[in-house]
Amino acid sequence: MAGIGTGGTIMGTGRRLKVYNPDIQIIGVQPAYPFHGIEGLKHIESSIKPGIFDETFLDRTIFVETEPAYEMTKRLAREEGILAGQSCGAALHAALELAKELEEGVIVVIFPDGGEKYLTTAPYKDL
């Protein structure tokens, strides 16, 4: 599971993982709305699609609203000591929602971005 920004991380990592295990599911995370505050992620339907991105490769896409992404980013910092970007908060929120649907399995979430460059922005300014 990874956020969809340029598409490079989810496409490259996903393709390589499928070589090792064709049954693995590749799940993308993107903002629920065109106008959002989740840095690093694209709302694909309203954006110019990056050339590397192939929507048909994904097994599923989970849409996340801005506030839950911000809240999860704050929780990562407060509870786990992980300074991550908002796209990471969105991806973790989506993973936890997915986990509620599963009886068993393993969910791997890619955190591609640190939070140091966002310290003066939401969600960190409220910490």
Where are the regions that the model predicts?
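Short glycine/serine/threonine-rich phosphate/pyrophosphate-binding segments
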Residues: G3-G14, S87-A95, Y118
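Conserved acidic residues
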Residues: M1, D59, G105
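Glycine-rich ThDP/TPP pyrophosphate-binding loop and its adjacent helix/strand module
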Residues: M1-I24, K100
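Phosphate-binding loop/pocket of nucleotide- and phosphate-handling active sites
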Residues: L96-L127
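Generic hydrophobic alpha-helical scaffold/packing signal
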Residues: G14, T61-I62, K74, L96, ...
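Surface-exposed, flexible loop/turn segments at secondary-structure boundaries
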Residues: G8, P34, A69, G115-E116
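Short beta-strand segments
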Residues: A2-G5, G28-Q30, V108-P112
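Active-site/ligand-binding loops adjacent to catalytic centers
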Residues: K18-Q86, E101, A122-L127
